[in-house]
Regions:
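N-terminal Rossmann-like NAD(P) cofactor-binding subdomain of oxidoreductases
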Residues: 1-199, 326, 334-335
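Structured loop/turn residues at secondary-structure junctions
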Residues: 100, 153, 209, 250, ...
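Short glycine-rich or small-residue beta-strand-to-loop segments that form or flank ligand, phosphate
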Residues: 4-6, 147-149, 243-249, 308-314
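NAD(P)-dependent Rossmann-like dehydrogenase/reductase catalytic/cofactor-binding core
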Residues: 290-335
Length: 335
């Protein structure tokens, strides 16, 4: 079965979802509709040329209200009300909600009213039927999960790591700091913002702010609910982020054991989700890396046998966009 998906919101994540599908060559998913309030030609241009990820790897043709990237015409609309979208006409299996605006179950469920069989939100979504981190809990998807959250890029980085470590050595409590590239909701110059930290110029500051990513791990791993917390430090890089995770293990462990646990999982049941490196790499080396999380082995530290610090990189755009497709395909198997 080839799952038919639509994308509402053709921004950083929306465009990268389409690009990831085309670059992967996978044939189990196809984009049949895009809704974005920008002009079709502008959306096509931003798809062709990308400052972070480079030129689109295929031709991008515009014909009236369609974009074609080699898999047939994709219908493009500019409809404000999600209930009025053409998902029934396009026979959409999974509507991908990528605007950042309709990030609650009630708001996202308007895609169901428009004819989509399921909805996948590219952000944490209050009230979602299930929050999924692919590779960690996607097996829990059932036909009753109509509105699903794909969590956040940071939760997708931390959750696989937390799962395997908790399974092997146990986590009493842990604290995460994500050193995170700036994103589209941050200004280029100081301006008004509901978060006064994020009101400051993105490219000129290191900005401490909040994140619910660590607590959200408890939504996908109930055994860790209430045991994790975290903060975010937004930094002046345009892409790639890193999770610095410190925790108290429930039993004594070592650097070697922690690294072996991660390496084994990355070569086994978390292959293509969790990667690892023992090279002296920096953030730009992980640009366009499709893993949810890439563990940096030579950064592991253990103090007094049970206080552990680990570091894991993630391309906060590309890895997450690849997981959106993976999760959509998993959802389609429940329809």
């Amino acid at each position: 079965m080839t799952v038919r998906v639509s994308i509402n919101g053709f921004g950083r994540i929306g465009r990268n979802i389409l690009r990831a599908i085309i670059e992967s060559g996978r044939d189990d998913i196809i984009v049949v509709g895009i809704n974005d309030l920008g002009p079709v030609e502008t959306n096509a241009h931003l798809l062709r040329y990308d400052t972070v990820h480079g030129r689109f790897p295929a031709g991008v043709k515009v014909n009236d209200d369609t974009i074609d990237v080699g898999k047939g015409p994709i219908r493009v609309t500019a409809i404000r009300d999600p209930k009025e979208l053409l998902w029934k006409e396009l026979d959409v299996d999974v509507a991908m909600e990528c605007t950042g605006i309709f990030a609650t179950r009630d708001k996202a469920s308007q895609h169901l009213d428009a004819g989509a069989k399921r909805v996948l939100v590219s952000a944490p979504a209050a009230g979602a039927d299930l929050t999924v981190v692919y590779g960690v809990n996607h097996q829990k998807l059932t036909k009753d999960h109509l509105v699903v959250s794909n969590a956040s890029c940071t939760t997708n980085c931390l959750a696989p790591l937390a799962m395997i470590i908790n399974n092997e050595v146990g986590i009493k409590q842990g604290f995460m700091t994500t050193i995170h590239s700036y994103t589209g909701d941050q200004p280029t110059l100081d301006t008004m913002h509901s978060d006064m930290y994020r009101a400051r110029a993105a490219a000129g500051n290191m900005i401490p702010t909040s994140t619910g990513a660590a607590k959200a791990v408890g939504l996908v791993l109930p055994e860790l609910n209430g045991k994790l917390d975290g903060v975010s430090m937004r930094v002046p890089t345009q892409n790639v982020s890193v999770v610095d995770f410190k925790f108290n293990a429930t039993r004594p462990t070592s650097v070697e054991e922690i690294n072996d646990i991660v390496k084994k999982a990355s070569l086994g049941n978390l292959k293509n989700i969790l990667g690892y490196t023992d090279e002296p790499l920096v953030s730009s080396d992980f640009n366009h890396d499709s893993h949810s999380s890439v563990f940096h082995m030579d950064q592991t530290k253990v103090m007094d046998g049970s206080f552990v610090r680990v570091l894991s990189w993630y391309d906060n755009e590309w890895g997450f966009s690849n997981r959106m497709s993976d999760t959509a395909v998993a959802i389609s198997k429940t329809i």
